[in-house]
Amino acid sequence: MSKNKLSKGQQRRVNANHQRRLKTSAEKADYDDNLFGEPAEGIVISRFGMHADVESADGEVHRCNIRRTIRSLVTGDRVVWRPGKAAAEGVNVKGIVEAVHERTSVLTRPDFYDGVKPIAANIDQIVIVSAILPELSLNIIDRYLVGCETLQVEPLIVLNKIDLLDDEGMDFVNEQMDIYRNIGYRVLMVSSHTQDGLKPLEEALTGRISIFAGQSGVGKSSLLNALLGLQNEILTNDVSNVSGLGQHTTTAARLYHFPHGGDVIDSPGVREFGLWHLEPEQITQGFVEFHDYLGHCKYRDCKHDADPGCAIREAVENGAIAETRFENYHRILESMAQVKTRKNFSDTDD
């Protein structure tokens, strides 16, 4: 049996009525002020849909609803919340988040549908964790560094699993890390297994809100477990004996407190920074050693590749800029172009 097709006017009225019902339902779903106590300050420990775990000043964690007027709430946000009155009927959670304080920083990741998606707030340090196994990738480190420079959050490079190096291997890795030390980045060499180098890392984390970034298999979770202590063990799967790669088991961003002071937000959203949403000029600015040479190329539209009179390429040839970094710069630009091409094709594919 065929069905009568709605006219455009009828369809508009159906859609309008549907939106009106949604709005009415949302308004009814909000909460009576009389059910909650006096406002208090707190910090979001984790976010789960329309609920958030909020830590109060006394260190207690409260599962809270979120006012529908709050458009964005992520781990690390400092908030005003109100505790639920225990005697009141209909209060199934411990409180409600009323407002969010202005953020000092926000870590985002690109999203194919929404542009960028916030995943953590108020961080002041990104710890880039790499390791000699399964592979020491300077390209991945450089991608993270571009992300840090774009977000204007201070990076700290941590090389894990140094207990697996012999003297010759240690010399080689130190030469690689000198590339970053020479342009002003902090580098720490550690082992979560033997705990070598953990003391300087603890000192670098004290008094800061950090987030650890690293690919699977670099020992990020094991390193966090060693720093946090057994009372705050983060789930970890063994590295596969076949692939040498680890399984990332964190499912939601969560804030933890270090025993020595400082906080860390562990999030699955920062295993690898997506950079495809950035413009090529932002990638160029993300390489700090390029800054002194920008604006000195022969041509204003210089691509810093085979262009004649390129000041950056000349600096590479003179040894002022590491050739590895220059090559990774172009690899990043190439990968961005490929992803944007796939995205544009997907957007136009009906």
Swiss-Prot record:
Q: Which domain of life is it from?
A: Bacteria
Domain CP-type G: from-to ranges = 104-273
A cellular component term from Gene Ontology for this protein is: cytoplasm
> Which compartments does it reside in?
Cytoplasm
Q: How is the cofactor bound?
A: Binds 1 zinc ion per subunit.
Molecular function GO terms recorded: GTP binding; GTPase activity; metal ion binding; rRNA binding
Q: Which EC number applies?
A: 3.6.1.-
A Gene Ontology BP annotation from the UniProt entry: ribosomal small subunit biogenesis
Residue ranges of the region described as Disordered: 1-27
Q: Where is the composition biased (Polar residues)?
A: 1-17
Keywords noted in UniProt: Cytoplasm, GTP-binding, Hydrolase, Metal-binding, Nucleotide-binding, Ribosome biogenesis, RNA-binding, rRNA-binding, Zinc
Instruction: Read off the Pfam families from this record.
Output: RsgA_GTPase
**UniProt: Zn(2+) binding residues:** C297, C302, H304, C310
Q: Which cofactor does it need?
A: Zn(2+)
Q: Which of this chain's residues are annotated to bind GTP?
A: N160, K161, I162, D163, G214, Q215, S216, G217, V218, G219, K220, S221, S222
| Class in the EC hierarchy, top level | hydrolase
Q: What is its main location?
A: cytoplasm
Asked if the keyword Iron-sulfur belongs to this entry, the reply reads no
Keyword Transmembrane recorded: no
Q: How does it assemble?
A: Monomer. Associates with 30S ribosomal subunit, binds 16S rRNA.
Note the PANTHER family from the entry.
SMALL RIBOSOMAL SUBUNIT BIOGENESIS GTPASE RSGA, SMALL RIBOSOMAL SUBUNIT BIOGENESIS GTPASE RSGA 1, MITOCHONDRIAL-RELATED
Primary role: One of several proteins that assist in the late maturation steps of the functional core of the 30S ribosomal subunit. Helps release RbfA from mature subunits. May play a role in the assembly of ribosomal proteins into the subunit. Circularly permuted GTPase that catalyzes slow GTP hydrolysis, GTPase activity is stimulated by the 30S ribosomal subunit.
Which family, according to UniProt? Belongs to the TRAFAC class YlqF/YawG GTPase family. RsgA subfamily.
What name does UniProt use for this protein? Small ribosomal subunit biogenesis GTPase RsgA
* Native source species: Salmonella typhimurium (strain LT2 / SGSC1412 / ATCC 700720)
Phylogenetic lineage:
Bacteria, Pseudomonadati, Pseudomonadota, Gammaproteobacteria, Enterobacterales
The record's gene field reads rsgA
